[in-house]
């Protein structure tokens, strides 16, 4: 019947679906998943006919406006297209399981991190905002005057505690796997030639064997990929590392910072 490709397709109302794409059959996409959720990162399972895994998380919406309120915990599900059966591979209300990918030998890799519930306004936070409002207003005024001074004199009003100038990207935050990661403090505290970890230690790269046993490959992982020969490549924000196997020692292959996506080409 020709080659089959798995795709993740976005919908108008903010959800996304896993679809089946056949290039030799007209190019249409047949949706394989449903529900008010974000479905992404589909991957065929090696050695099994028409079986794939994917990442999914439910969408919480406002009961009147239908606007997004947040996302539920991300899990990894397995689908057998021959039988129509679905099975949870990695699912826990306290964790996100992200970016599933298979090695050639059938080992499943994914990222695991603690789940952070979406924001719900609290009375205590509202009262705290009222108390801190004068201080925040003063800080905003000082920041405005500092920018004004830089524009006309080239010199800041504040010099104490100014971070050293560094080359390369210097964002305040990055949006990574559905969550904003603030890097202002890490950048400020880091020395000129080094950078603190950009993601928490509990962001783990996990390997799951066919028998269900799991092994933590690395911590502080923000992105990864598995090569055709089974080599593991991952980034922790300070560089890109390679491991020939789960038990091997990682080797730094690039000093590029803030690598948010890795892919093997060719």
Regions found by a protein language model. Give the residues of each.
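Beta-strand-rich domains and repeat architectures in extracellular enzymes and scaffolds
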Residues: 1, 181-201, 217-226, 260
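Residue-level signal for WD-repeat beta-propeller blades
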Residues: 12, 36, 45-46, 70, ...
